[in-house]
Amino acid sequence: MPKYYQYQIAGYYLYYTSHCIIECMHVHASDKKLTEGGSAKFFVNSDGSTVLQNRGILSDIEIGKIQKFIKINYLEMFEKWSMDSDKGFFDQQ
């Protein structure tokens, strides 16, 4: 599972899975096991805002920190995403 970054944000790794690149750009947030069970899933819009599809076990504070991080770094994250997927942002589908 490709990680967007090798470090954690609010205690979670941000990543995507190779089988989910058929969807528009999104970010999973999970613990060190990188399991989808209990993970959060954020769809990313072209302005860096996100739509939370699944909150998993994350608290409101953790979700807010991750959303803020994505908003600041979404273009860099999209470059990584685009290496594996031809799908664009959530609001461009």
Question: How should these model regions be labeled?
Answer:
Residues 1-25:
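Short, charged/polar N-terminal "headpieces" of proteins
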Residues 12, 20-21, 47-48, 79, ...:
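Short linear sequence elements within intrinsically disordered, low-complexity coil regions
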Residues 15, 41-42, 68, 89:
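Intrinsic disorder/low-structure terminal segments
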